[in-house]
């Protein structure tokens, strides 16, 4: 009988240790665990806040930019900027976490600034034909900018109460 109690105590401590580990992970890096739909009620305000941060950072004003949230299946894209109607489309099913949402929206806003003109679009397409998507300097600069600004944007979104993590 004494051996059974020892097993029960060991199992109890293993379960408690795993639970404590999961809570600790959720507290330390929640942006890599939760999806955007789980942590915010108003994605439009999140978009406007990210846009305002980028406008302040670059010292410019972006007029008439709209955003669409698409929940349909798409195997290739997380989002794209359409210069014809000056809009961003985000494929929400392809973004598992807050981190990927913020990075994608920042990249697409960056594209709306630097690829929105006819000459910018021609330059983008020229690079795309010559070196492909992964080596396109306009794509690379958008990705680097998004990575550099993630912590600042994430902090502002949390401070304004636009995203909140339930642990």
What are the residue ranges of the model-derived segments?
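Short, polar/charged, Gly/Pro-enriched helix-capping and turn/loop motifs at alpha-helix termini
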Residues: 61, 119-120, 156-160
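Short pre-active-site segment immediately N-terminal to the catalytic Zn-binding motif
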Residues: 88-105
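A metal-dependent hydrolase signature that marks the N-terminal structural subdomain at the beginning
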Residues: 2-78, 82-87, 96
């Amino acid at each position: 009988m004494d051996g059974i109690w020892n097993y029960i105590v060991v199992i109890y401590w293993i379960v408690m240790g795993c639970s404590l580990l999961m809570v600790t992970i959720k507290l330390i890096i929640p942006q890599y665990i939760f999806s955007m739909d789980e942590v915010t009620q108003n994605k439009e305000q999140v978009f406007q806040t990210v846009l305002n941060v980028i406008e302040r950072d670059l010292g410019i004003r972006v007029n008439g930019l709209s955003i669409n949230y698409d929940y349909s299946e798409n195997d290739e894209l997380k989002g794209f900027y359409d210069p014809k109607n000056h809009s961003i489309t985000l494929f929400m099913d392809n973004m598992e976490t807050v981190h990927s949402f913020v990075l994608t929206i920042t990249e697409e806003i960056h594209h709306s600034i630097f690829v929105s003109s006819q000459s910018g679009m021609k330059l983008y397409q020229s690079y795309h034909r010559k070196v492909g998507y992964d080596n396109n300097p306009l794509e690379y600069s958008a990705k680097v900018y998004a990575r550099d600004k993630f912590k600042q944007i994430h902090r502002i979104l949390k401070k304004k109460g636009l995203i909140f993590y339930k642990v």
